[in-house]
A protein has these predicted regions:
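N-terminal interaction/assembly modules
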Residues: 1-151, 155-169
């Protein structure tokens, strides 16, 4: 288990959301690209903050940083710690997901869904952030990065994880 005590940010802050988004991109890269977490983290961090995409294609946290330039260090800290912790605890996290997604094998899930669930499960089990806020932000990630059914799928599985692990909503 990791010794990280969670983010020292307010719930639903741009920094926390950006940290999750960078973590998601890095986990996705590790999952589908078969690259080491530190390499994925560095690439995703650089791409997130140095994007040349048009503003309409940026996520809300990314647009915030492009407009203000504030909170970058806090976001990087969250992403780095979260990626390291999830990489270390991935087997335990996947076991929790597997138990709560009775009709879906993790290997059958889309990589984006699988990795949003890993982030959400990690945060729910650690209890750093209120469960409702974790689920809300994971659903927002699913809306931006997933297909049409992805937000409902993420919401349902994370809600089941809360029920199965006696996590108050």
């Amino acid at each position: 288990m990791t010794d990280w005590n969670g983010p020292t940010l307010t719930t639903r802050s741009h920094e926390l959301r950006a940290g999750r988004e960078i973590t998601l991109k890095a986990l996705y890269s590790v999952d589908v690209g078969d690259i080491a977490p530190p390499v994925a983290w560095q690439r995703c961090q650089d791409a997130f903050f140095l994007s040349v995409s048009p503003p309409s294609s940026l996520s809300q946290p990314q647009a915030h940083f492009m407009a203000t330039g504030q909170g970058i260090d806090a976001s990087i800290d969250v992403a780095r710690h979260m990626l390291q912790a999830i990489a270390i605890e991935r087997m335990d996290i996947d076991t929790i997901i597997r138990k709560s997604s009775k009709r879906w094998r993790i290997s059958r899930m889309q990589p984006i869904e699988r990795n949003i669930l890993r982030i959400g499960t990690f945060e729910l089990i650690k209890g750093f952030i209120p469960a409702r806020d974790v689920i809300y932000d994971c659903v927002e990630l699913a809306k931006f990065y997933g297909d049409e059914p992805t937000p409902g799928f993420i919401n349902g599985i994370l809600d089941q994880i809360c029920q199965d692990n006696q996590i108050a909503l």
